């Protein structure tokens, strides 16, 4: 199976080389790797140039004005090939065997829209936390906030493109916004509970982290859309999920 790896990059001079090399060290796969420089103002472009010079057939670099991570992901998606796509944030890294294992799991599981992976969160002060996925199906995992995180998962290209890709103006809840569109069209998932990704929590956080009101509004509106969809299905299977969504929305 052909796998694409898209690495959005913005001012990640301390991390990006480790991210790229973690992809190069994957065994059993030869991914199509594209790094998208999203208008970096630090040494990120120079480091990417050096990596391309080192292995020109194993990395391509796209450059664009700063438009945000989702726009960079979509740009990389459009320029790569592969049945499944790994979106790797440039401050994260993959552990050995992650791509081959999840690709094989996808084949065995009937090619779901997403392989949900386990990961380890690491903070600058040395704290760590391992996060394992769980859930009986796509919607229960969505409602239970058990859909991994961007870098831990493997995404089916055809489903991504059919859903319209990443929503570029979505400032928070980005993974869950995309997943809800995939699942509305009947997408299924499979869980990979083997640790496959290191997710680094950068000390300065993200732009959206300080927008508490906006984040809460997006959180509630997204759950309202999912509740409406599940209610329209008129299935007893979803009664408990709908009740849980109402609790999350403070209803």
Residues covered by each model-derived region:
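Acidic metal-phosphate-binding loop of nucleotide-sugar-dependent transferases
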Residues: 92-93, 170
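Short, acidic, metal-binding catalytic loop of nucleotide-sugar glycosyltransferases
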Residues: 21-30
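Conserved nucleotide-sugar donor-binding catalytic segment
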Residues: 117, 135-219
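Conserved donor NDP-sugar-binding/catalytic core segment of glycosyltransferases
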Residues: 97-129
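Short aromatic/hydrophobic "clamp" motif used to bind/position activated sugar donors
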Residues: 85
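Glycine-rich, basic loop-to-helix element that forms the pyrophosphate-binding segment
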Residues: 64-80
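A conserved acidic beta->alpha catalytic loop
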Residues: 22, 37-46, 65, 89
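Acidic helix N-cap motif at the loop->helix transition within catalytic regions
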Residues: 14-17, 42-51, 93, 97
